């Protein structure tokens, strides 16, 4: 019986009996088809099953009986069709296997098509059941067809349909492709491993190592635990040697790169020989003793008045300027002449091409003049001597200075050497043109050239913190072209160039060789004299800066360990003055630090707890309070709020604008902290003339004071034939019968000494006194 016969006829009780008989016969003849469903559910014999069915059907209404029979019949038909389709699928699969050239995609497509057709047939069978139920309702009630209560049979029907679908879909790959589900992880892990070259730095975490190998961090941790017996966290640092072993176990190649390799060739310009070079302006540095007119001479070239604005009449920063003269550019660097700025002068000598040693005609060669000469000679740069202030010098001063230069290994042209000497006057602008010609002549002879088409490198002149700009640094480009947006590393600081301003305050986008430029964008404050270089990425800049910072940290730890024993031995004896130092620029910090460090002695020392560029902050005051320190502010303004806070906390703040005033005050502070020195001073002497034995008192020594004075609290030394036979204190000092405090020269006195002393006539008594003297640094 097919589905069309069932759907076209109404089923009566007589029809049901006949259908039941046919169904039982088919079930006994073919157990695998529909009968197994009933047996599986009830698990009874054929006779018992038939009785139970009659009983069950008798308890149901006519409508329910017909619906139950129709459902069972359709389930049997569905099972039979599914079996046939399953056999067809198996046959197709065998054909596909025999044909090795046929693509698997064709097979999947055919299977998917079969799956869709089967789904349609299942839906048709469900519709067939609903149609029979509707026909039965029309026969009994002659009303509109009513839908069957699906809640009674939905669970049973769903189980039959789901079982039929499961029988048809036995291949998981077909089901997964039908619904788009794939085991992506298994497919990924089965892929072919790629061998990589893994860079191993001095320090690396498990997470970073896993990323570089393109491996799962869990696999790395598991391997470490199982094969090496090590327990690590994902963010834990691993030894470089262990990291190399891990890389090799994952079939990769390890390349060990130490921090030193990061610095290697950092300042090397690739293809230097092939890149074109262009002439660059000379960098000229004015050096010399304090107040010899270096800044005034530079002002005469620049036609400005910087010297008049400088506090104390001395330069305390390195200044960089660029002027145009005779259609040629010259970059000038002005360095401080005070002895505290030795590091700045050394920095200026290393950066420059030409050094102009400025000597005042009335003072001649001084201490810092000699130091500047030594810096210039050590840097192997050309030297010009400018004898300034000739407008107020006396006759013969210039000749005297010229004749003294050879003793400093500077042979002037007047004496057959190659050092140009130019007498000038910055105030009267005398011979400035001759000095300018000398500079341009030497620059032309030196043939100064630089590559412009390469990454920039150069030097830091000075750095500071500005409230509006943040951290800024003044640079001199040595080679290459510096641009806004370049990533550079300088000392332990790095960052992207955010802005560039020239010495006139004008914004620039590029800076060529020998150009002084002020930049912003660094994450830290570099030191004057640090060398900068443009790098390819922020990662490279950060790694180099961190490596340098680590080196500095290691050096400090070594120094601390070496001095630990010394400090522990002397800690109880050494007085310490702690200070917090805040300055306007890094150059001032270095100069002041070096100067006040030299003030310390064995019994007193100055400890700089913290030094930084910028204004005084709340944390500075709190640090000073906790450490009983003094705050020194150099060229830094102090807010009223900070002063109030310091007053409440009992912290002293001393502000300075001239460096030697700060140094003098620190010397005075340390001097007051020094313990006075106790010295033994001879104050007089007396000769023994007679010895009296007094009962109940002892020996009384009769003396004559030959010089000085003998005091009652004097320390007495008894000398016999220039040998010390006794040292002690006076027990009593009398003149006649009266006790006196002292006896002067040419007077007689009687003394008694502590202890038993063998005194003879002719012995000499020397009177000494302990005197405390203030120490001076």
From Swiss-Prot:
GO cellular component: cytoplasm
Residue ranges of the region described as G3: 334-337
Compositionally skewed regions (Basic and acidic residues) per UniProt: 98-109
Residue segments, region Disordered: 30-54, 98-117
Stretches assigned to the tr-type G domain: 279-449
Region spans: G5: 425-427
Region G2: start-end pairs: 313-317
Keyword annotations of the record: Cytoplasm, GTP-binding, Initiation factor, Nucleotide-binding, Protein biosynthesis
Function: One of the essential components for the initiation of protein synthesis. Protects formylmethionyl-tRNA from spontaneous hydrolysis and promotes its binding to the 30S ribosomal subunits. Also involved in the hydrolysis of GTP during the formation of the 70S ribosomal complex.
Entry protein name: Translation initiation factor IF-2
Organism: Wolbachia sp. subsp. Brugia malayi (strain TRS)
Higher taxonomy: Bacteria, Pseudomonadati, Pseudomonadota, Alphaproteobacteria, Rickettsiales
